[in-house]
Amino acid sequence: MTTMLKGIAASSGVAVAKAYLLVQPDLSFETKTIADTANEEARLDAALATSQSELQLIKDKAVTTLGEEAASVFDAHMMVLADPDMTAQIKAVINDKKVNAESALKEVTDMFIGIFEGMTDNAYMQERAADIKDVTKRVLAHLLGVKLPSPALIDEEVIIVAEDLTPSDTAQLDKKFVKAFVTNIGGRTSHSAIMARTLEIPAVLGTNNITELVSEGQLLAVSGLTGEVILDPSTEQQSEFHKAGEAYAAQKAEWAALKDAETVTADGRHYELAANIGTPKDVEGVNDNGAEAIGLYRTEFLYMDAQDFPTEDDQYEAYKAVLEGMNGKPVVVRTMDIGGDKTLPYFDLPKEMNPFLGWRALRISLSTAGDGMFRTQLRALLRASVHGQLRIMFPMVALVTEFRAAKKIYDEEKAKLIAEGVPVADGIEVGIMIEIPAAAMLADQFAKEVDFFSIGTNDLIQYTMAADRMNEQVSYLYQPYNPSILRLINNVIKAAHAEGKWAGMCGEMAGDQTAVPLLMGMGLDEFSMSATSVLQTRSLMKRLDSKKMEELSSKALSECATMEEVIALVEEYTK
């Protein structure tokens, strides 16, 4: 029987394929007394060998998607599997206690995990504990004969169904086989959504319970355009979805013709369309989609994909590659934004009641613990500045004094490099992200000291509305077009322009087709979005009149009380 679910349309596109459930299996087992210890040893050896082969395959695929350094985590996992001491201890438990391989494996690995986790002053050993946990799950799954999901090993067309997708999950996805994904939780601004748009994979998020309704291999039809997911679609419904997919492909072909065109409105006004990236590999997509700049380079992925703090030289090479890849076009680099939901296995973050409101981003950089990291990153950026048009911005700034402190460290490192005879570019612009309401309200004072603003709407909206963007129960409060949000944004843009500075936006709102006309009217200078949204936004801007959009935004700011009123007004002015 056909069932239809409605979720959040998070990444455009249409797909019809079999479901691949990316859910953790039940790995519970009973401890059994056994007589044939040789057979248990053989079962263990077979599970270890199969796990080793799987991890090698996963690593080989991860090298192509993540790069050699990031994929090295799988080397650590394979070293655990190949550890003769651990294997010998597991076999000793099998023989001494006459228990099944599952029980012996758990006893020995739990012992090692406990020892390593107890070394609180040794980040390397704590990281090994995490490796053992991951490897134990894989070996246990093979002993129990249950499937452990491995996205990297998918070799047929599927639609991923999951509670949510982690950065490591999405990094393993092969677009050739993964045609879409659907999750229980998440929204348009969640990591899963952003990655889906970057990879150009259709996605529907926030369905609440799809993992409970779908079985492995069940046929699904997914529309990232409407947010619809159909379980067991009829032949007629499959045909409708295929037609919708063809229509969307034709639309994309029309947009592709604008790749080398200027972003100019119907009345001749130019706006800068930029793209957001997470790794140097993303630059190719930026250029393929005709972006005029990079408005946000999320450098924290350099840290998250490494096994230890990236060195100054490692970072220099990454920043150099991005700047050279953009051939002189502007690149805005955000200094590391660690904390919140972005953790590092080799850097201890405190357990906090509200990590998104806690010790993160620039707050870490300005601390004693983060000072060395921050200076290393700034030195690498300054060294790379000679390879392109670099702009630097600091995230999570609430106070003018925070910006001054960060700028002071920047100036100190710049002076040191120059004294060492290291070339540094002239005229590097240094700005801040506006993502905290306090900074948005005080934009007029910040504008006197910074070179530019980049509005980070993903956090600005959730902080202003006091609504966790990942919490489905309060998702109705996450309103990009709420008049309160629009007034904050307008305040920031006007404050920048009053001091002769420029204002950009790097949140997902910058590529939102309802928000773009409003932002044009407010005078936003740079729109930075997922690279795959650039051409669609250029197409929209080319048919709009900037003067008319000024009327629209003025009316929305002065007359609208609700998000619904704003949306209706945009529809009236853009139809």
From Swiss-Prot:
The reaction takes place in three steps, mediated by a phosphocarrier histidine residue located on the surface of the central domain. The two first partial reactions are catalyzed at an active site located on the N-terminal domain, and the third partial reaction is catalyzed at an active site located on the C-terminal domain. For catalytic turnover, the central domain swivels from the concave surface of the N-terminal domain to that of the C-terminal domain. The active site is at H191, C506. Mg(2+) binds at E435, D459. The gene is ptsI. Pfam families: PEP-utilisers_N, PEP-utilizers, PEP-utilizers_C. Its cofactor is Mg(2+). Homodimer. The keyword DNA-binding does not apply. It comes from the Bacteria. One of its GO terms (molecular function) is phosphoenolpyruvate-protein phosphotransferase activity. It catalyses: L-histidyl-[protein] + phosphoenolpyruvate = N(pros)-phospho-L-histidyl-[protein] + pyruvate. Its EC number is 2.7.3.9. This is Phosphoenolpyruvate-protein phosphotransferase. Keywords: Cytoplasm, Kinase, Magnesium, Metal-binding, Phosphotransferase system, Sugar transport, Transferase, Transport. General (non sugar-specific) component of the phosphoenolpyruvate-dependent sugar phosphotransferase system (sugar PTS). This major carbohydrate active-transport system catalyzes the phosphorylation of incoming sugar substrates concomitantly with their translocation across the cell membrane. Enzyme I transfers the phosphoryl group from phosphoenolpyruvate (PEP) to the phosphoryl carrier protein (HPr). GO terms for biological process: phosphoenolpyruvate-dependent sugar phosphotransferase system. Belongs to the PEP-utilizing enzyme family. It is found in: Cytoplasm. One of its GO terms (cellular component) is cytoplasm. It is an enzyme of class 2 (transferase). InterPro entries: PEP-util_enz_mobile_dom, PEP-utilizing_PTS_enzyme, PEP_util_AS, PEP_util_C, PEP_util_CS, Phosphohistidine_dom_sf, PTS_EI, PTS_EI-like. The keyword Manganese does not apply. Gene3D superfamilies: Phosphoenolpyruvate-binding domains, Phosphohistidine domain, PtsI, HPr-binding domain. The N-terminal domain contains the HPr binding site, the central domain the pyrophosphate/phosphate carrier histidine, and the C-terminal domain the pyruvate binding site. It comes from Lactococcus lactis subsp. lactis (strain IL1403). Phosphoenolpyruvate binds at R298, R334, N458, D459, R469.
